[in-house]
């Protein structure tokens, strides 16, 4: 059996743009993608901390070092520049590997720079 497990997360990213007329997806600074091992065209879930909206889309590489987090297409209706979002990527893990799998979590500042890397979350942690 396989389970769907959280394998990567960009925590408290700041939306830099919302582009309604783009084809679709989310554009993410490639440095941030690399930090948590998210690849172009991979499916992600986005949770908007400001309004509670949740959506799924795929990733497009953004310029390295730019800090870009841009929601494109229909997703642009669910965010505003400045909103705080959590970008989560899941993967299928075989039952025998459940306890060996450790996610990569990057906690970001207001400029989408990594301030901390976590390997796991602990209950009651407030960031």
Curated annotation (Swiss-Prot):
Pathway listed for it is: Cofactor biosynthesis; (R)-pantothenate biosynthesis; beta-alanine from L-aspartate: step 1/1
The residues that hold substrate are 57, 73-75
Broad enzyme group: lyase
Where does it localize?
Answer: Cytoplasm
Per the record, residues carrying Pyruvic acid (Ser) are: 25
Superkingdom assignment: Bacteria
Q: Which GO terms describe its molecular function?
A: aspartate 1-decarboxylase activity
InterPro entries named in the record: Asp_de-COase-like_dom_sf, Asp_decarbox
Choose any GO biological process term that the UniProt entry carries and state it: alanine biosynthetic process
Similarity-based family: Belongs to the PanD family.
Kindly provide the name given to this protein in its UniProt entry: Aspartate 1-decarboxylase
């Amino acid at each position: 059996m396989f389970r769907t497990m959280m394998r990567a997360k960009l925590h408290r990213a700041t939306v830099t743009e919302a582009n309604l007329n783009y084809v679709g997806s989310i554009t993410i600074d490639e440095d941030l993608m690399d930090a948590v091992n998210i690849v172009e065209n991979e499916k992600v879930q986005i949770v908007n901390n400001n309004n509670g909206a949740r959506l799924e889309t795929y990733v497009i590489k953004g310029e390295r070092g730019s800090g870009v987090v841009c929601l494109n297409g229909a997703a642009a209706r669910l965010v505003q520049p400045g909103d705080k979002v959590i970008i989560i990527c899941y993967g299928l893990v075989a039952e025998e590997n459940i306890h060996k799998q450790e996610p990569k979590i990057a906690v970001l500042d207001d400029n989408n720079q990594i301030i901390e890397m976590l390997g796991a979350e602990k209950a009651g942690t407030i960031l």
